[in-house]
């Protein structure tokens, strides 16, 4: 055993052992309790960043802990390999996305290996490989035949630079999230997953996920957005519109129907199109609306604009004529693309009506308090729907509360055939068509005679050609006759293959299930293996995936269940959302007002007495730089730390220990070079103590029955650490406090005597405990030390230590003694001492006597096991 801790040598030794013994290869063992631990798989961007390192280290610590509990643990890894960045890199470097992707995977896999992760690499999946996506295509054809996937024209966000459709979430402030181009609205045929058919179940079954953070469940509930209301028909005014019909609107507030003063329709609505035929100004406004974003977030923040048409509809209860307006805040894909406007009781309508001078009618009044209604100032109570308000100015519906008005107006509308109660969801169907090359081909053939024909199972997969270098102008597949020319599977006539590819969220919606049986060729999943491993027991990933990825994965799990592929309802039992990794930022302001960011490694900082950074200079020129505060590590702020350089300098165990110690996993982690140094120092201390102990020869067995009082205290410290770490790692994922408990134990062991055989046997137990408690966190050093401490089996096969409760029992207790509430001494008493004995010992304490001399003792308060307070005057 080397005298010095040499991480690179140790880590190579441990990793070679795991490889040779296939230590992390697992199979289904029906008689053994399973534990499936999964971290969200990475996009193969080229290099791991610290966010990855944190994510995968957390997963690895949890996996290794459960293995030490005797469970059959699966921890797989794969690559979310389709997507736009590969196309961008391909254009930049003039290389096929496939080649770029596979090179990145090879490098990142070696990086993951160097971290010492307990991954079963035999289950690796790569989503851009045909043996993976063929089953996605197979499921697509099944769902298309069942009507769960359908094709329709959709209004989409068109990015004119990337020449592709963007999801609402990819449009930020009306611009494309990658290109920054102003987004246009376009109508194109697209394929949709009918996720709305599962909206109710997706909402309800959130209640069956107690292991998920409440915040994530709330975000999903809001995204699904269930609301109860009515669909109301406003009959067309035939004089202005020219024919009969109804404008249908959905509202959650039919109780305010008597306050409707106009209706607003989306730019794409048929009435808008009709009104614009002879109105160039209106047509220009409609074109402007179509260029705006279609994301709800954009619509909420953008300026509300509208234009009157020459058309009218009739109020369904009064018959009054209401003008039809075109407004940029009405979405064609929400309900029927029309809303009734009640400016008196809806803040958005109120602003709009004031802006364009439209009538505002009060139909709800506050029962008490400030109940003045002013049409120029919005007050919170205008929008209330509780017992604080009643209807007014509503004819026969006056003096009713929200529910009573809802029911009365609803009944009359139903009787006239102009309304029905409905539940609506905010959730929209999931459009998955992408006009991109590097994605999974949609398995549909377009035939003039037969329509859209799914590719038969025996002709799957539809393989994406991998040697294409995109040029950035639209989809390359649409320019490749060798890809799209084919014959119709139904009639045999010449036909055309679909050239759109699927949204890459599709691949990540079912990968967790394929890990159960990645080599299975008889279907999408091997039901037996899937039912053994699923659901995932612990899923780990960033909070930024709270809505889309996690919702789509839950949806897909239910689709697979309904196809008979899995037996469970939900994919992830427990969810841990890890915090970001943040670091200091430094910059100089450039001549044009921009910022030049400098990496912390290139900056020298000056600290005050409290170690706070008070100044910073660039190492290269010695000139000052501005301090920008701590921010998430990113390329744009140039504050990332390369994990590889850290591993090369200190070893993976130091990196892992720092990551787990610096903060609880769900909080942000602030990068600190001093913290990394500290983690490394601690591992050197562990090594030093073990080396000194092993060099003196391993001791015999510990005889617990003959321990001295001092030795009992050392053994108590050992078992306190086990108890603390077991709670922190096993129950709460508080790895930082578990590590703190081990550090406390190390302090005790370093000071413990090692004179006789019992002393040395006690240090042996202490070091074994340190190694076992650290084994999930710093596996390499623990692998080597476990062998040095005399164990033939590997530490990964050792059991997590259990607490010996008898070691925690104290024969004597040290109590605090106070006089009139002030600390005046300590006493040692037998743990079994009576109250009288404790009081007598306190009164007899030398220091206490000094402070009670000449005073009469009024009373003595004894808090068992803690303190004695003598009240004297």
Curated annotation (Swiss-Prot):
Gene Ontology annotations for the cellular component aspect, listed alphabetically: cytosol
Gene3D superfamilies, per the entry: 2.20.28.290, 3.10.20.590, HUPs, Isoleucyl-tRNA Synthetase, Domain 1, Valyl/Leucyl/Isoleucyl-tRNA synthetase, editing domain
Reactions catalysed, as given in the entry: tRNA(Leu) + L-leucine + ATP = L-leucyl-tRNA(Leu) + AMP + diphosphate
Disordered as annotated region, ranges: 624-643
GO biological process: leucyl-tRNA aminoacylation
Sequence motif 'HIGH' region, residues: 42-52
Location of this chain's protein in the cell: Cytoplasm
EC primary class: ligase
GO MF term set: aminoacyl-tRNA deacylase activity; ATP binding; leucine-tRNA ligase activity
Cited InterPro entries: aa-tRNA-synth_I_CS, aa-tRNA-synth_Ia, Leu-tRNA-ligase, Leu_tRNA-synth_edit, M/V/L/I-tRNA-synth_anticd-bd, Methionyl/Leucyl_tRNA_Synth, Rossmann-like_a/b/a_fold, tRNAsynth_Ia_anticodon-bd
Motif position, 'KMSKS' region: 632-636
EC number: 6.1.1.4
Keywords: Aminoacyl-tRNA synthetase, ATP-binding, Cytoplasm, Ligase, Nucleotide-binding, Protein biosynthesis
Amino acids binding ATP: 635
Family listed: Belongs to the class-I aminoacyl-tRNA synthetase family.
Name of the protein described by the UniProt record: Leucine--tRNA ligase
Species name: Pseudomonas aeruginosa (strain LESB58)
Gene: leuS
């Amino acid at each position: 055993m080397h005298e010095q801790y040499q991480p690179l040598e140790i880590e190579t030794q441990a990793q070679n052992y795991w490889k040779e013994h296939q230590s992390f290869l697992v199979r289904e063992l029906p008689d053994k309790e399973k534990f499936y631990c999964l971290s969200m798989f990475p996009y193969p961007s080229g290099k791991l960043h610290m966010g990855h390192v944190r994510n995968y280290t957390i997963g690895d610590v949890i996996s290794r802990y459960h293995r030490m509990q005797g469970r059959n643990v699966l921890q797989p890894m794969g690559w979310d390999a389709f997507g736009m960045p590969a196309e961008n890199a391909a254009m930049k470097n003039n290389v096929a996305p496939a080649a770029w992707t596979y090179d990145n995977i090879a490098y990142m896999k070696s990086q993951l290996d160097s971290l010492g992760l307990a991954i079963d690499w035999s289950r690796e999946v790569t989503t851009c490989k045909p043996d993976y996506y063929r089953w996605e295509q197979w499921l697509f054809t099944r769902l298309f035949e069942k009507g769960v996937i359908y094709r329709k024209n959709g209004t989409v966000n068109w990015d004119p630079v990337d020449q592709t459709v963007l999801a609402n979430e990819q449009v930020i402030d009306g611009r494309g999230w990658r290109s920054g181009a102003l987004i246009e609205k376009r109508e194109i045929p697209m394929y949709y997953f009918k996720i709305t058919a599962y909206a109710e179940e997706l909402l309800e079954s959130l209640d069956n996920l107690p292991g998920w953070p409440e915040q994530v469940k709330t975000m999903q509930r809001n995204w699904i957005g269930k609301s109860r209301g009515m669909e109301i028909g406003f009959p067309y005014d035939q004089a202005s519109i020219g024919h009969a019909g109804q404008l249908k609107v959905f509202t959650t507030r039919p109780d305010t129907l008597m306050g409707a003063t106009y209706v607003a329709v989306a730019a794409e609505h048929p009435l808008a199109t009709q009104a614009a035929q002879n109105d160039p100004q209106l047509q220009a406004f409609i074109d402007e609306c179509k260029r705006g974003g279609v994301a709800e977030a954009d619509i909420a923040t953008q300026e509300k604009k509208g234009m009157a048409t020459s058309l009218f509809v009739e109020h369904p209860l009064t018959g009054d004529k209401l003008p039809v307006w075109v407004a940029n805040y009405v979405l064609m894909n929400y309900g029927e693309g029309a809303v009734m406007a009640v400016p008196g009781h809806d803040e958005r309508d109120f602003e709009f009506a004031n802006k364009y001078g439209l009538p505002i009618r009060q139909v709800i009044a506050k029962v008490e308090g400030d109940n003045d209604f002013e049409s120029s100032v919005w007050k919170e109570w205008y929008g209330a729907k509780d017992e604080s308000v009643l209807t007014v100015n509503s004819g026969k519906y006056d003096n009713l509360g929200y529910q009573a008005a809802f029911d009365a107006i609803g009944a009359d509308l139903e009787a006239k055939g102009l309304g029905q109660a409905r539940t609506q969801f905010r959730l929209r169907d999931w459009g998955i068509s992408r006009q991109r090359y590097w994605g999974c081909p949609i398995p549909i053939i377009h035939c003039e005679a037969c329509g859209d024909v799914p590719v038969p199972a025996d002709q799957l997969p539809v393989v994406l050609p991998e040697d294409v270098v995109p040029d950035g102008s639209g989809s390359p597949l649409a320019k490749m006759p060798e890809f799209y020319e084919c014959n119709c599977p139904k009639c045999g006539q010449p036909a055309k293959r679909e050239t759109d590819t699927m949204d890459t969220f599709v691949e990540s919606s079912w990968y967790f299930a394929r890990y159960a049986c990645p080599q299975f060729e008889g279907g999408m999943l091997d039901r037996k293996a899937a039912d053994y491993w699923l659901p995932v027991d612990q899923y780990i990933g960033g909070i930024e995936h709270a809505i889309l990825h996690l919702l789509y994965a839950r949806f897909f799990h239910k689709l697979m269940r309904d196809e008979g592929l899995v037996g469970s309802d939900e994919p992830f039992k427990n969810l841990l959302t890890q915090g970001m990794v943040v670091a200091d930022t430094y910059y100089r302001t450039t001549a044009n007002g921009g910022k030049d960011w400098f990496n912390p490694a290139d900056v020298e900082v000056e600290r005050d007495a409290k170690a706070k950074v008070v100044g910073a200079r660039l190492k290269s020129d010695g000139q000052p730089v501005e301090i920008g505060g701590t921010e998430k590590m990113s390329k744009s702020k140039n504050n990332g730390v390369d994990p590889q350089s850290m591993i090369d300098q200190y070893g993976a165990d130091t990196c892992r220990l720092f990551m787990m110690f610096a903060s609880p996993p769900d909080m942000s982690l602030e990068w600190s070079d001093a913290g990394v140094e500290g983690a490394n120092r601690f591992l050197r201390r562990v090594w030093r103590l073990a080396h000194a102990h092993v060099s003196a020869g391993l001791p015999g067995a510990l005889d617990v029955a003959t321990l001295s009082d001092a030795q009992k205290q050392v053994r108590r410290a050992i078992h306190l650490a086990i108890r603390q770490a077991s709670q922190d790692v096993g129950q709460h994922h508080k790895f930082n406090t578990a590590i703190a408990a081990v550090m406390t134990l190390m302090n005790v062991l370093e000071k413990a005597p090692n004179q006789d055989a019992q002393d040395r046997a006690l240090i042996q137990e202490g070091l074994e405990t340190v190694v076992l408690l650290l084994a999930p966190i710093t596996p390499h050093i623990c692998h080597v030390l476990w062998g040095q401490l005399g164990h033939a089996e590997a530490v990964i096969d050792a059991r997590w230590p259990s607490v010996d409760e008898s070691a925690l029992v104290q024969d004597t207790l040290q109590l605090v003694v106070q006089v009139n509430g002030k600390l005046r001494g300590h006493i040692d008493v037998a743990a079994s001492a009576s109250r009288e004995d404790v009081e007598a010992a306190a009164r007899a304490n030398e220091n206490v006597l000094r402070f009670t001399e000449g005073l009469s003792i009024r009373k003595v308060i004894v808090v068992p096991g803690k303190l004695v307070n003598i009240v004297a005057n």
